[in-house]
Every structure is written in C-alpha cells, then in structure tokens.
C-alpha cells in the first residue's frame, strides 16, 4: 500500500528529515486506515500569515490556525457516483502553519516533531471523513489520532 504524497515547505524552515518523517507517518496512517493504494494527498507548510489568509478566505475566521484540510473526494448530496472511475482518489490538501506548530510544541511541552506529526495526522483524518463537530465525533477522532501516533511511536512526552 502506498500513498502518493506531495510535501512542500513554503517557509523553508522545516528540515528535509522532518518532512520525510511526516511522509512516513502519513504512509503509516494510510495503511492502518485501509486507504486505497496510490491515493493522493498534498501537505503544504506555510507561515502564520499565509494560514491566517486561508482561514479568513475559506472558513470566515480572521485568525491564524494550526492546520486546515480541504477534502477533494467528498460526494455531495445529489451527486452520482461515476461508474468505471476506478482511479485512485485524490484525498485532498493539508495545510500546516510552521509557526503555530512551533508555538504549540512549546506550549504543550513536547517536540516540534511530535506536534507536526499530530497536526499532519489530524488533517489526514479530516480528509478521511473524521470530524469533531460533536462530542461523539471528537472522541472518535481524537482517540484515533492518539492510537495512530502512539503506534507510530510519536507519544506525547
């Protein structure tokens, strides 16, 4: 099973080693979640200013955030499934603020690597349809996040 991952660090502040770690973690999560082989996802690391603009434009929230996901393979109400479209899905985009990652790592007293991994998995689970709008959804999603991160070896310190 292999996920096709395109990772871009627009800030130039995240090491190649750390970007590779994100790729490995997402491959691990995709395998554990049974994601279709050759499914595609993009990860973009941006500044607080950039994610602030994205958050304002697409979510109507005038503040920076840590991670935003844009799922591309959601069937909307009234849409029909395309017969014969067996192409691997394009799951969507995960956008992570490098600045917020650093701030939150410090705030929660754990490593940048752990926080970046947490945010990548959080965004990835959103692409797979998980959410945290209700207490039940939040419990399911956050339990899944913790299980994946712990199994991968990125436990909270």
Swiss-Prot record:
Its EC number is 3.1.-.-. InterPro entries: MetalPrtase_cat_dom_sf_prd, YbeY, YbeY_CS. Its cofactor is Zn(2+). It is found in: Cytoplasm. The keyword Transmembrane does not apply. Keywords: Cytoplasm, Endonuclease, Hydrolase, Metal-binding, Nuclease, Ribosome biogenesis, rRNA processing, Zinc. Binds 1 zinc ion. Gene3D superfamilies: Metalloproteases ('zincins'), catalytic domain. GO terms for biological process: rRNA processing. GO terms for molecular function: metalloendopeptidase activity; RNA endonuclease activity; zinc ion binding. Zn(2+) binds at residues 122, 126, 132. Transmembrane segments: none annotated. GO terms for cellular component: cytoplasm. Pfam families: YbeY. It is an enzyme of class 3 (hydrolase). Its main location: cytoplasm. Single strand-specific metallo-endoribonuclease involved in late-stage 70S ribosome quality control and in maturation of the 3' terminus of the 16S rRNA. Belongs to the endoribonuclease YbeY family. This is Endoribonuclease YbeY. The lineage of its organism: Bacteria, Bacillati, Bacillota, Bacilli, Bacillales.
């Amino acid at each position: 099973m292999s996920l096709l991952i395109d990772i871009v660090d627009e800030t130039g502040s995240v090491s190649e080693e750390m970007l590779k770690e994100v790729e490995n973690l997402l491959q691990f999560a995709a395998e554990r979640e049974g994601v279709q082989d050759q499914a595609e996802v993009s990860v973009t690391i941006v500044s607080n200013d950039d994610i602030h603009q994205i958050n304002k434009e697409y979510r109507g929230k005038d503040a920076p955030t840590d991670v935003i996901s844009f799922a591309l393979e959601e069937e909307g109400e009234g849409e029909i499934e395309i017969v014969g479209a067996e192409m691997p899905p394009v799951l969507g985009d995960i956008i992570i603020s490098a600045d917020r990652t650093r701030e939150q790592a410090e705030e929660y007293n754990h490593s940048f690597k752990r926080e970046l991994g947490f945010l990548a998995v959080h965004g990835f689970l959103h692409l797979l349809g998980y959410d945290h709008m209700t207490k039940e959804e939040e419990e399911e999603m956050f339990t899944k996040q913790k299980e994946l991160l712990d199994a991968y070896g990125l436990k909270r310190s």
